[in-house]
Amino acid sequence: MYAVIKTGGKQYKVAAGEKLKIEQIPAEIGSEITLDQVLAVGEGASLKLGDPLVNGAAVMATVVSQGRHDKVTIFKMRRRKHYQKHQGHRQNFTEILINTIKA
């Protein structure tokens, strides 16, 4: 069984037992969270689409860790003008383990 969930402005296809890095959510490590914005649920050849969400569907997950992604370096330069600008960014994430999918 799989589901398509929406969290942090992005959509993810998940199945039970998968680990996933999503945008940071305020939750303690080891706590169980419920992701209730389920867009689709499928099993085998059957697929249940929401309009826009599937009624009564939820995905239960456990928070494994909180962290930060690798640094992304931004470099701007104007040729012949001696203008150079360096900037870096590290995005926070939450790693979750999908426990069950309730449809």
From Swiss-Prot:
Sorted UniProt keywords: Ribonucleoprotein, Ribosomal protein, RNA-binding, rRNA-binding
PROSITE patterns in alphabetical order: RIBOSOMAL_L21 (PS01169)
Entry GO CC: cytoplasm; ribonucleoprotein complex; ribosome
Pfam family, one: Ribosomal_L21p
The keyword Hydrolase is annotated on this UniProt entry: no
GO molecular function: rRNA binding; structural constituent of ribosome
Keyword Cell cycle attributed: no
Record-linked InterPro entries: bL21-like, bL21-like_sf, Ribosomal_bL21, Ribosomal_bL21_CS
Record SUPFAM superfamilies: L21p-like (SSF141091)
One GO BP: translation
Known partners and oligomeric status: Part of the 50S ribosomal subunit. Contacts protein L20.
Functional note: This protein binds to 23S rRNA in the presence of protein L20.
NCBIfam families (alphabetical): L21
Family, as annotated: Belongs to the bacterial ribosomal protein bL21 family.
Protein name, as recorded: Large ribosomal subunit protein bL21
Gene (UniProt): rplU
